[in-house]
C-alpha cells in the first residue's frame, strides 16, 4: 500500500535535512537511512546514482530551468537518464503534462507561468521517470488557496495512481491533513509526535495542538533563546 508521510514543523527543525539524507547528499551521524531496502550512506557512487534515478524531487518554488520551455524541463531527466528516442520522450512528456492538467502549456516558458502552474510543471518533472519515491520540499509555499488545493489534490492522486511513496515536507498542517496517511512532527532533528490524520486531530499533546491550532503560545517559544532582557539592558550600566 502506498503512503504519503509528512514531516512538519518550524523552520530550521531539520525537515529538509531529512530529504538530503534520503537522497544521499548527507550522511547521518548515527542511525540508518534505508530506501528500498538499501542503506543509502553505504552505497557506491554508481549505486547511489541509480537509486536517485528512482526518486523524484519537487523543490521549493519548483526550481524550473528558466531558459527551457515547459516541455524541455520535463524532457530533461528523460534525456539525462535514458536513451529513449525523441518520439517516445515527446509522448511521455505530453502524458506527464496531461496528468497535471497542463498539456496545453508545453511550449510556454517558466516566466509565463503562474505560481501554481509552475509548481504543477515541477510536479510533472518529478514523476518524469516513474519513480518509486517522490520527495516534496514545501510544495505549498507561496501558493494562493486555489492553487494550493489543486497541488495537494494532485500529490494525493498521483501517489495513489502511480503506487509510489510520497514524503512531503511542509508547514501547512491543515492542507496536509486532507492528503496524507501519516504525519511526523519534527523538532530540532527529532520526531516529537506522529500519527494518522484522525489521531492528530484528536491529539491532546501540547506540541501537536499548538501546531494544528496555530497557537502563538505553547512548547514552541516565540522568543529565540537569549540572555535575560533585563541583564542585556543593564549590562553596560553594571559594568
Feature annotation, model-predicted:
Residues 109-113, 117:
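Conserved ABC ATPase signature
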Residues 213-239:
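ABC ATPase nucleotide-binding domains
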Residues 130:
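Conserved catalytic motifs of ABC-family nucleotide-binding domains
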Residues 134-137:
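Catalytic Walker B motif of ABC-type/P-loop ATPase nucleotide-binding domains
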Residues 38-39, 86-105:
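Conserved ABC ATPase "signature" region
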Residues 23:
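Helix-to-loop junction immediately C-terminal to a conserved catalytic motif
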Residues 40-56, 86, 200-203:
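ABC ATPase NBD coupling module
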Amino acid at each position: 500500500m502506498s503512503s504519503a508521510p509528512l514531516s512538519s514543523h518550524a523552520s530550521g527543525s531539520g525537515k529538509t535535512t531529512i530529504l538530503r539524507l534520503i537522497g544521499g547528499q548527507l550522511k547521518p551521524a548515527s542511525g540508518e537511512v534505508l530506501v528500498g531496502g538499501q542503506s543509502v550512506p553505504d552505497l557506491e557512487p554508481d549505486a547511489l546514482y541509480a537509486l536517485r534515478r528512482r526518486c523524484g524531487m519537487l523543490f521549493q518554488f519548483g526550481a524550473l530551468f528558466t531558459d527551457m520551455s515547459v516541455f524541455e524541463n520535463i524532457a530533461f531527466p528523460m534525456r539525462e537518464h535514458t536513451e529513449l528516442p525523441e518520439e517516445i520522450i515527446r509522448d511521455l512528456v505530453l502524458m506527464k503534462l496531461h496528468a497535471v492538467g497542463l498539456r496545453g502549456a508545453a511550449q510556454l516558458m517558466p516566466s509565463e507561468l503562474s505560481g501554481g502552474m509552475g509548481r504543477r510543471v515541477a510536479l510533472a518533472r518529478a514523476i518524469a521517470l516513474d519513480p518509486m519515491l517522490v520527495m516534496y520540499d514545501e510544495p505549498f509555499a507561496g501558493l494562493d488557496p486555489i492553487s494550493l488545493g489543486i497541488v495537494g489534490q494532485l500529490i494525493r492522486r498521483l501517489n495513489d495512481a502511480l503506487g509510489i511513496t510520497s514524503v512531503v515536507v511542509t508547514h501547512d498542517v491543515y492542507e496536509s491533513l486532507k492528503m496524507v496517511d501519516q504525519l511526523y512532527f519534527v523538532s530540532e532533528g527529532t520526531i516529537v509526535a506522529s500519527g494518522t490524520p484522525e489521531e492528530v486531530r484528536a491529539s491532546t499533546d501540547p506540541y501537536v495542538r499548538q501546531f494544528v491550532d496555530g497557537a502563538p503560545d505553547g512548547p514552541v517559544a516565540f522568543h529565540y533563546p537569549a540572555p535575560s532582557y533585563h541583564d542585556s539592558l543593564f549590562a553596560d550600566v553594571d559594568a
